């Protein structure tokens, strides 16, 4: 009997299987596909008649990178596609040589594996259309569960987090599990609107920052318990109702974040289609006055988006929960926990801007459009770490990183 490892994973992973030529996307189109050193050497010495010419001409060493993980890369063809795909968008390397010849990047996508305190966690990126369907359309929400996997399975670990040990005794990371469990439960608390849940997360983060600044991290669990008790009272809902809505500022910031990405280049036709529909749906054309665009935004929201999202709010909830889990929030790759909050608010507000614009363009919304937007948005935005850092910097440099400004970005 094979030895197994325990892995924490969202339940949708059990149902995931690549759908190959039926897929709307090509996994590697317009991406940098890295090759690990072991795979690079296997390709360069392979004598397969069909693949050898491509192995010799379409694979380049990364001479400025000393890492064995990003040792080389595949050179995309003139259409920005992977030269190893056949006419059905299937991988010729897999077909000719088998799964064992795939690089770490190609064998793992769209799976994303981390290690937390010695235990593996695996989720998937929503940039894969099939993952988007499985993860986002589940009305019951994302359920995390422990499964057993073969110890000899090929698993590429992205990175991880250690919350144990004396060196972390006074650091926020020690309370990772308390913070994580609270916030995932918060995002799935349907007694509150999703807007309110994200605002409450910001309130909690500010409390955590204050305790950390005062050297009272040990009080974090008690504070989280107190917030759980407060959320059971109607008084908090009344306070949240008093937060003002400012569509003009919301539009200005969110549009600027979107422009920053579009102007830097977008390698996804599906996302560009969504952007064009968003701009047309909001009347965001050359010479348009901001007040007219704001009026159109509010009109789309009330006519089309509000009705749809009241019934399908779980789609956006599932997206945020998946990102929160996958990115090891509030830590992961972020410099501070507030940076992670700026990120989650930014992607949430950008997705809503697109959907509200698209709802005006199509005179309504349906799941297929919503999935297309979120999947292609994830492909373009979430897969560009430099852009993620740039939007955090833009928000900070503009002076819009306070909780009050974050609430304006969130509130619809």
Regions picked out by a protein language model, each given a short descriptive name:
Residues 31, 94-98, 116, 171, ...:
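Conserved aromatic-histidine-acidic binding/catalytic patches
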Residues 1-103, 107-152:
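N-terminal cysteine/histidine-rich coordination modules
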């Amino acid at each position: 009997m094979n030895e197994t490892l325990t892995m924490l994973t969202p339940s949708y992973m059990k149902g995931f299987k690549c759908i190959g030529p039926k897929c709307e996307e090509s996994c590697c189109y317009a991406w940098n596909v890295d090759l690990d050193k072991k795979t690079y050497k296997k390709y360069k010495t392979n004598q397969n008649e069909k693949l050898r010419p491509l192995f010799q001409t379409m694979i380049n060493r990364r001479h400025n990178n000393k890492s064995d993980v990003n040792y080389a890369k595949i050179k995309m063809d003139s259409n920005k596609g992977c030269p190893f795909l056949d006419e059905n968008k299937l991988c010729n390397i897999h077909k000719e040589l088998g799964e064992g010849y795939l690089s770490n990047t190609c064998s793992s996508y769209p799976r994303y594996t981390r290690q937390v305190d010695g235990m593996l966690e695996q989720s998937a990126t929503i940039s894969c259309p099939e993952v988007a369907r499985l993860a986002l359309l589940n009305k019951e929400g994302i359920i995390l569960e422990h499964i057993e996997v073969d110890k000899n399975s090929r698993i590429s670990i992205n990175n991880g987090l250690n919350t144990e040990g004396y060196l972390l005794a006074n650091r926020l990371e020690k309370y990772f599990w308390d913070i994580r469990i609270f916030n995932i439960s918060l995002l799935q608390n349907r007694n509150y609107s999703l807007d309110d849940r994200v605002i409450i997360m910001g309130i909690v983060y500010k409390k955590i920052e204050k305790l950390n600044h005062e050297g009272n991290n040990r009080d974090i669990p008690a504070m989280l318990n107190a917030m759980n008790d407060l959320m059971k009272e109607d008084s908090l809902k009344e306070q949240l109702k008093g937060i003002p809505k400012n569509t003009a500022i919301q539009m200005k910031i969110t549009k600027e974040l979107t422009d920053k990405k579009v102007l830097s280049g977008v390698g996804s036709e599906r996302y560009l289609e969504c952007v064009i529909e968003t701009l047309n749906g909001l009347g965001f054309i050359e010479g348009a006055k901001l007040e007219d665009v704001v009026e159109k935004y509010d009109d789309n929201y009330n006519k089309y988006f509000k009705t749809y999202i009241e019934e399908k709010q779980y789609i956006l909830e599932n997206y945020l929960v998946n990102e929160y889990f996958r990115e090891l929030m509030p830590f992961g790759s972020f410099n501070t926990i507030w940076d992670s909050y700026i990120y989650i608010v930014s992607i949430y507000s950008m997705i809503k801007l697109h959907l509200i614009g698209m709802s005006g363009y199509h005179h309504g919304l349906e799941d297929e459009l919503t999935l297309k937007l979120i999947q292609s948005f994830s492909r373009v935005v979430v897969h560009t770490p430099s852009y993620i850092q740039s939007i955090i910097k833009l928000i900070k440099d503009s002076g819009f990183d306070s909780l009050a400004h974050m609430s304006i970005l969130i509130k619809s």
